[in-house]
């Protein structure tokens, strides 16, 4: 299909606009008037009829032998004017236009358009109607009530109609809005109980409990539509594959014994298509001279052509509403007559058989070897003669498949966030459908893939200018039929090429694709047969997300239609963390952990550390509200318990929408601001949440000598750098800090959160810190029995000045029994030391501690929060083994560009265990760049280390 004119200039003065709308019946290839490059408008696009002011009508005068053309302003591209042949469009009324415009995927829009019954019922859906909503393909439909019907964004001449639905019963909590869209309250319902959807996600619950047909109706689903019979000798058109063929009506009536199916039409085609002999079930329906170009179709598959009288009128003709393309998808199992090229019963011929018949072959015959169709990929935005494939003139262009290429239908969930790709199927030499022997990447820019060994150091990627704003991480498409969709993983210019390429990662394997290599050089890494390389200028932003307008307010974006595919569950039942193998199976993978959004990594990683595999703070989730608590105490606690912690432990995933709800609550505190948008520190978050909102009993009670007990939730290590120390342990750092500040724990903590010595986020006091798996805090507790550092008896005195003495247990806190203390301080260099008595329980019998019976107070490391370049990630321990470590990043991957979505990921990192077995000397001498996997971040970027008491976790 081609057009006569394409203008990117704003359509104001040259044309009159009328409220008449048309839908394209097939993809249109057009030329940009300014750049002379080829552009495409997909099948299913909707245009508004315009008139040329200068001549009083909208048609380009036809050349000899050519038909008139209709002027359209494409609604999805409001500054574009397109002139198309009348046979390539069908008129639709304004009400249907509004319903269809809300469906952003043109292919799905076209499928719904063909289902007249379903579309007509959409007009009946109004506020108050009971409906069922399909949130995710393959899952149950949730009941609901329509609370809003209308446009979400009234920016065009005509706007798409969306339905705001309040979900009921089991659907409650499965939505993503409370009726607010971009700051406007369009209807009211409880939070997460509402959705905004287009008609294709909706089913009207009728009195007889029969719902609307499915999104892709089978061939029989629309046969009940009553259309008037066509006149004999009238001109008609029909869709064959991707082309429109014309012919003359020679028969129009019901079939004997099939009256309930409505009218069938016999057509004498202009081109040799079909071989119907005028008979059905042994009955001669009509007679004609030639049977080499005749077919029999249901009337719903026929597009009435324009009459001569109508073509002379100013207004373009009103074409038949229903245009069921014979090559389009549909059920192949319905036993209803469609078309036949022989005397066989059309009631026993399926849609695939019909496609064979229309291409001039019997169902059982081999497909034709020649075709006028071109089965290679044209380069988008360039002259069609210059294809992406750069195929030479002697390229063997096999005939197209005689069955339409299957198109992967998009799940509701995929339409929001995943990579719902459709792969173009290419014909094999025998005519069967198969993947292309060379992927688009291979055909577009190179001769052979296997000409050089894989290099590990690829050329540097470059950020070229791109008018479409595409970047690494953007969802992009290469517009073909069906299109290629992918996420851009790399952009740059390989050696020897003058073109800037984009490397896309596909979801489904495609023959000829690689695992991220191109011409033997690796540019990114993905699964085998999923890496596709194309010219960057051939890529466009993913058109399926065109209606998801950029939301300037990223806070409200969590409540927009875009996040519908990322919803997580609500779990009321209190759930302990799953440990060892069970926890590993739940937690690892992509879209696992807590989804990051808009500077939330500090909060995501902190919550994951505290609750994913530890119950030490679970009492925070259970304390009943008291009279002194803030008014939103219960709301916060319930949100944490049922929408964050419990779902994380059962399903391993929490969406950003839930975290944004918590961030909004944090901003209610007078002392807090910026929690919904700004980068924050974990300690600031913990202080607001624990102290101001939940009023958690302080985790730590610390006393400085002779002072009152100080309450806090975490401990920040302050100290001067010791150049003699290469790699300190957490044990050493904590003891140094307590000794230098003369501090003691007033009581043993159940949870100890230690903040590493830093100056701000960036400057680290030590290049590496060894996270002690076990922390002995016995010597840091007051009123606790302690062992003599020399004899092991009950210590009575402690000397801070002996701490650095290398002759006595270097690097250890020094406390001695009465006898050993006297002996130690007889040495000349210790004569002037000032030692202090150790505080002991008043009722402690001295004899109980004489023979090494003094217990130790140990704490276990359960999580480490790390930071690098202002981005927080987490390491958590899921089991007893030293290698039982998981790494969590709430923004590990990206689905789309600036207005895309973060994909959280949890990955096992058993290599951590091997490094924690190394000596401190070996770790110190080890180049950080040689540390494998995630272990480098654990050893080099630790920000907070979290310990729990194995015996006291139930009490605090």
From Swiss-Prot:
Q: Which Gene Ontology CC terms are recorded?
A: centriolar satellite; centrosome; ciliary basal body; ciliary tip; cytosol; microtubule; nucleoplasm; perinuclear region of cytoplasm
EC numbers, comma separated: 3.4.19.12
Ranges where the record places region Interaction with IKBKG/NEMO = 470-554
Stated consequence of mutating residue 422 to E: Abolishes deubiquitination of TRAF2
Q: Which CDD domains match?
A: Peptidase_C19N (cd02670)
Where is this protein localized, as stated in its record?
Cytoplasm; Cytoplasm, Perinuclear region; Cytoplasm, Cytoskeleton; Cell membrane
Please report a single Pfam family linked to this protein: UCH
Q: How is it modified after translation?
A: Ubiquitinated. Polyubiquitinated in hepatocytes treated with palmitic acid. Ubiquitination is mediated by E3 ligase TRIM47 and leads to proteasomal degradation. Phosphorylated on several serine residues by IKKA and/or IKKB in response to immune stimuli. Phosphorylation requires IKBKG. Phosphorylation abolishes TRAF2 deubiquitination, interferes with the activation of Jun kinases, and strongly reduces CD40-dependent gene activation by NF-kappa-B.
Enzyme class (EC, first level): hydrolase
Where in the body, by tissue, does this protein show up?
Answer: Detected in fetal brain, testis, and skeletal muscle, and at a lower level in adult brain, leukocytes, liver, heart, kidney, spleen, ovary and lung. Isoform 2 is found in all tissues except kidney.
Q: What is the effect of changing residue 444 to A?
A: Loss of phosphorylation
Q: Which SMART domains match?
A: CAP_GLY
Q: Which keywords label this protein?
A: Amyotrophic lateral sclerosis, Cell cycle, Cell membrane, Cell projection, Cytoplasm, Cytoskeleton, Disease variant, Hydrolase, Immunity, Innate immunity, Membrane, Metal-binding, Microtubule, Neurodegeneration, Phosphoprotein, Protease, Repeat, Thiol protease, Tumor suppressor, Ubl conjugation, Ubl conjugation pathway, Wnt signaling pathway, Zinc
Q: What is the effect of changing residue 422 to A?
A: Reduced phosphorylation. Loss of phosphorylation
Topology in membrane: Peripheral membrane protein
Q: Which family does it belong to?
A: Belongs to the peptidase C19 family.
Q: Which disease is it linked to?
A: Cylindromatosis, familial: A disorder characterized by multiple skin tumors that develop from skin appendages, such as hair follicles and sweat glands. Affected individuals typically develop large numbers of tumors called cylindromas that arise predominantly in hairy parts of the body with approximately 90% on the head and neck. In severely affected individuals, cylindromas may combine into a confluent mass which may ulcerate or become infected (turban tumor syndrome).
The annotated subunit structure for this chain is: Interacts (via CAP-Gly domain) with IKBKG/NEMO (via proline-rich C-terminal region). Interacts with TRAF2 and TRIP. Interacts with PLK1, DVL1, DVL3, MAVS, TBK1, IKKE and RIGI. Interacts (via CAP-Gly domain) with microtubules. Interacts with HDAC6 and BCL3. Interacts with MAP3K7. Identified in a complex with TRAF6 and SQSTM1. Interacts with OPTN and SQSTM1. Interacts with CEP350. Interacts with RNF31; the interaction is indirect and is mediated via SPATA2.
The free-text function statement in the UniProt record for this protein reads: Deubiquitinase that specifically cleaves 'Lys-63'- and linear 'Met-1'-linked polyubiquitin chains and is involved in NF-kappa-B activation and TNF-alpha-induced necroptosis. Negatively regulates NF-kappa-B activation by deubiquitinating upstream signaling factors. Contributes to the regulation of cell survival, proliferation and differentiation via its effects on NF-kappa-B activation. Negative regulator of Wnt signaling. Inhibits HDAC6 and thereby promotes acetylation of alpha-tubulin and stabilization of microtubules.
What protein does this entry describe? Ubiquitin carboxyl-terminal hydrolase CYLD
The taxonomic lineage of its organism, from the top, reads:
Eukaryota, Metazoa, Chordata, Craniata, Vertebrata
């Amino acid at each position: 299909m081609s057009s006569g004119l394409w203008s990117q200039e704003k359509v104001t003065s040259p044309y009159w606009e009328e409220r008449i709308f048309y839908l394209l019946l097939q993809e249109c290839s057009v030329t940009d008037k300014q750049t002379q490059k080829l552009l495409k408008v997909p099948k299913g696009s909707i245009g508004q009829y315009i008139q040329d002011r200068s001549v009083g009508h909208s048609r380009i005068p036809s050349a000899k032998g050519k038909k008139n053309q209709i002027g359209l302003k494409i609604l999805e591209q409001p500054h574009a004017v397109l002139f198309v042949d009348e046979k390539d469009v069908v008129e639709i009324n304004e009400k249907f236009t509004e319903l269809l415009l809300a469906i952003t995927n043109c292919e799905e829009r076209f499928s719904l358009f063909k289902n007249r019954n379903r579309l007509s019922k959409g007009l009946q859906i109004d506020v108050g109607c009971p409906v069922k909503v399909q949130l995710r393909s393959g899952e149950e439909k949730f009941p609901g009530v329509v609370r809003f019907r209308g446009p979400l964004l009234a920016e065009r001449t005509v706007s798409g109609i969306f339905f705001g639905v309040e979900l009921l019963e089991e659907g409650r909590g499965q939505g993503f809005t409370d009726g607010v869209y971009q700051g406007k309250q369009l209807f009211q319902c409880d939070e997460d109980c509402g959705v905004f959807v287009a008609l294709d996600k909706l089913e009207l619950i009728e009195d007889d409990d029969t719902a609307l047909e499915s999104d892709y109706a089978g061939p029989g689903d629309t046969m009940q539509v009553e259309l008037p019979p066509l006149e004999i000798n009238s001109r008609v058109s029909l869709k064959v594959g991707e082309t429109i063929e014309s012919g003359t009506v020679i028969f129009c009536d019901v079939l004997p014994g099939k009256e309930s199916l409505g009218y069938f039409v016999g057509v004498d085609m202009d081109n040799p298509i079909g071989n119907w002999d005028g008979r059905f079930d042994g009955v001669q329906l009509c007679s004609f001279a030639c049977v080499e170009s005749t077919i029999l179709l249901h009337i719903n598959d026929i597009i009435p052509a324009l009459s001569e009288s109508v073509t002379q009128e100013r207004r373009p003709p009103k074409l038949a509403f229903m245009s069921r393309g014979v090559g389009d998808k549909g059920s192949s199992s319905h036993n209803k007559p469609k078309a036949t090229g022989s005397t066989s019963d059309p009631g026993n011929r399926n849609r695939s058989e019909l496609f064979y018949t229309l291409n001039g072959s019997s169902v059982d015959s081999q497909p034709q070897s020649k075709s006028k169709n071109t089965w290679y990929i044209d380069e988008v935005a360039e002259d069609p003669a210059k294809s992406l494939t750069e195929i030479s003139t002697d390229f063997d262009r096999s005939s197209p498949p005689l069955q339409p290429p299957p198109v992967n239908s998009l799940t509701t969930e995929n339409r929001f966030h995943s990579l719902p790709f459709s792969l173009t199927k290419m014909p094999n030499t025998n005519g069967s459908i198969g993947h292309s022997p060379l992927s688009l990447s291979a055909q577009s820019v190179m001769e052979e893939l296997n000409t050089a060994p894989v290099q590990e150091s690829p050329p540097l990627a470059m950020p070229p200018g791109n008018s479409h704003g595409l970047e690494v991480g953007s969802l992009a498409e290469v517009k073909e039929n069906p299109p290629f969709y992918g996420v851009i993983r790399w952009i740059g210019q390989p050696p020897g090429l003058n073109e800037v390429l984009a490397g896309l990662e596909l979801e489904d394997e495609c023959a000829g694709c690689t695992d991220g290599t191109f011409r033997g050089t690796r540019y990114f890494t993905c699964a085998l047969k999923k890496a596709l390389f194309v010219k960057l200028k051939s890529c466009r932003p993913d058109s399926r997300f065109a209606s998801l307008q950029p939301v300037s307010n990223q806070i409200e974006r969590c409540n927009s239609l875009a996040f519908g595919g990322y919803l997580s569950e609500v779990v009321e039942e209190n759930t302990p963390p799953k440990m060892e193998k069970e926890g590993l199976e739940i937690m690892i993978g992509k879209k696992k952990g807590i989804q990051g959004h808009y500077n939330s990594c500090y909060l995501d990683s902190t919550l994951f550390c505290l609750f994913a595999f530890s119950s030490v703070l679970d009492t925070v989730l259970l304390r009943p509200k008291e009279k002194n608590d803030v008014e939103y105490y219960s709301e916060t606690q319930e949100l944490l318990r049922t929408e964050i912690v419990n779902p994380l432990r059962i399903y391993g995933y929490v969406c950003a929408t839930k975290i944004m709800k918590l961030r909004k609550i944090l901003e209610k505190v007078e002392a807090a601001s910026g929690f919904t948008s700004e980068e924050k520190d974990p300690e600031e978050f913990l202080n607001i949440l624990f102290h101001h909102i939940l009023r958690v009993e302080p985790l730590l009670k610390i006393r400085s000598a002779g002072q009152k007990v100080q309450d806090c939730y975490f401990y920040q290590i302050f100290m001067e750098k010791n150049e003699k120390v290469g790699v300190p342990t957490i044990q050493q750092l904590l003891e140094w800090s307590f000794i230098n500040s003369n501090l003691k724990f007033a009581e043993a903590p159940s949870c100890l959160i230690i903040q590493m010595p830093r100056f701000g986020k960036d400057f680290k006091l030590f290049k590496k810190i060894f996270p002690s798996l076990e922390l002995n805090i016995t010597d840091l507790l007051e009123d606790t029995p302690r062992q003599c550092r020399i004899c092991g008896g009950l210590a009575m005195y402690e000397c801070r000045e002996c701490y650095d003495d290398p002759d006595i247990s270097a690097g250890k806190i020094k406390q001695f029994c009465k006898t050993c203390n006297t002996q130690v301080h007889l040495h000349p260099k210790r004569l002037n030391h000032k030692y202090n008595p150790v505080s002991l329980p008043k009722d402690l019998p001295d004899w109980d501690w004489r023979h090494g019976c003094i217990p130790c107070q140990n704490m276990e490391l359960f999580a480490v929060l790390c930071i690098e370049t202002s981005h927080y990630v987490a390491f958590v321990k899921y089991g007893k083994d030293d290698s039982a470590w998981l790494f969590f990043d709430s923004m590990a991957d990206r689905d789309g560009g600036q207005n895309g979505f973060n994909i959280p990921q949890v990955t096992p990192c058993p290599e951590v265990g091997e490094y924690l077995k190394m000596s401190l000397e070996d770790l110190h001498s080890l180049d950080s760049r040689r540390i494998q996997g995630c272990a480098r971040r654990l050893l080099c970027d630790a920000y907070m280390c979290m310990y729990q008491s194995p015996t006291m976790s139930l009490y605090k």
